[in-house]
A protein has these predicted regions:
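A structural signal for small-residue-enriched, beta-sheet-centric alpha/beta enzyme cores
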Residues: 1-157
Length: 157
């Protein structure tokens, strides 16, 4: 996840265990792991939804990457791009912002790149970028940057 690309001590999730209830067998461990992942995803989304001044929740999926690392790098390049986040706040489908952010991250973008998004007018926006270079993908959760974000951080004391 990324709200503004900055690390904050205010948004954290801790997972603690007393080890008092042992997990028995692979089936129990798999179920426990699945449920922990579900809770972590819900908490991650909640942190983004509660981002300072955020008006939109944005799910970015980079697919068709050569490697998992490239997919993750591409996702964070968009999630941390002020120009991309401002364009989404303005409901402006300026896909040049996406290509520029990927290029800045060192990802070569082919001419046949595919970019799709749900309606930018909605509170929840999904952006899918297909690099068409391989079989890896990664999803990042972020939010837009708004005038309220600037106001909150300009007046911070």
């Amino acid at each position: 996840i990324s709200v503004d690309g900055c690390t904050s001590t205010n948004d954290a999730v801790f997972f603690l265990s007393s080890k008092k209830v042992p997990l028995k067998g692979k089936k129990q461990l798999d179920l426990f792991s699945k449920k922990v992942k579900e809770v972590c995803i819900k908490l991650a989304k909640k942190i983004v939804e509660d981002g300072e001044g955020a008006s939109k929740f944005i799910e970015i999926t980079i697919k068709g990457a050569k490697t998992k690392r490239q997919a993750k790098k591409g996702g964070f390049a968009l999630a941390n791009s002020n120009l991309f986040k401002c364009a989404l706040y303005g409901e402006n489908a300026n896909w040049g912002r996406i290509v520029a952010a990927l290029g800045q991250a060192g990802i070569k973008v082919a001419e046949n790149i595919s970019i799709k998004a749900t309606s930018l007018k909605k509170k929840q926006v999904s952006v899918i970028v297909d690099l068409k270079k391989g079989g890896f993908q990664h999803t990042i959760y972020t939010c837009d940057l708004t005038p309220a974000y600037i106001k909150i951080n300009a007046e911070y004391s």
